[in-house]
Amino acid sequence: MKNFIIRLFTAIAIVAVQVLCTYLSPYSFAGLFLLLTALAVNEFLKILSHGGQVQVSRPLMIVGSCYLFFAFWLNSLAELSMLVLFVPYLLFLLFCYIRELFSNNSNPVFNLGAMVLSQTYVVLPLSLVNMLAFGHYDCFSASAPFYAIPLTLYVFIWLNDTGA
């Protein structure tokens, strides 16, 4: 029973922080999701490297992941040019690709796969939440708050998890 109560209060605290950061401002939203992106990529790469075959530079991947999230956030909020924001990320990917091909690792293909998988499977969905929150859609009025779609998404995910 004690374990259940600890889990319950932890879940309530996490939900409260997530809803509050989403509701307050675009900056708190970005801060929370930037932190979630970094932690998720770190955990994902830790799981992949557990068997010993994959050896990816986690700090480098975390920096690249945070940049991708930040580029989507800036693109959604400030409507800066996609070229200006995403060319540095493409150069980062090219650097990682070349670095891995010329490294002395025994499995460079596994490492490249882990890098690409971490960016597409973990970072891209978290980064695209910015497009949901700050995108300009014709079906919504201009007075609709930015947090309406992400909070609705949270509710649907929580209801789905609870019902499963």
Which stretches of residues belong to each language-model region?
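Membrane-embedded alpha-helical bundles of polytopic integral membrane proteins
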Residues: 1-164
